[in-house]
Amino acid sequence: MTELKQTGTFRKWWKKLRDERARALVAARLNRLAYGLAGDAEPVGDGISELRIHYGPGYRVYYQQRGATIIVLLCGGDKGSQAKDIETAKRLAAEWKE
C-alpha cells in the first residue's frame, strides 16, 4: 500500500465538503489509489494527475506520485474550479517539502 500525504489545502477542502455521499466516494477513490488503482485519472502537467469522481458537480482531487509516496491531495475541487485548482496543485507540488 502506498503512503498518501495531504496538504493543508486539501484538508481545508475536505472539511468543507458536506455532502456525505461525495465524501464516501472520494474516500473510496483515495483508498483504491493507495493500492495502485487510480481508475479515472488524467495527467494535467508537471507530474500532477487529476482523479475524477463522477458525482455531483464532478469532484476532482489532484495528486503527484514521488517514489513510494503519493502527495495527495494537493487540493480538491470540482469541474467549475478546475483551471484554478490545477494551477494551485502545481504550485503546492513545487512547494512540497518532505
Task: Locate the predicted segments by residue.
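Flexible, active-site-adjacent loop/turn segments at secondary-structure boundaries
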Residues: 2, 15, 42, 46
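Enriched for short, Lys/Arg-rich terminal
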Residues: 3, 12, 20-23, 38, ...
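Local sequence-structure signature of Cys/Sec-based thiol-disulfide redox active-site neighborhoods
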Residues: 6
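Residue-level recognition of oxygen-bearing side chains
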Residues: 9
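A short, surface-exposed loop/turn module that caps and links secondary-structure elements
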Residues: 28-55
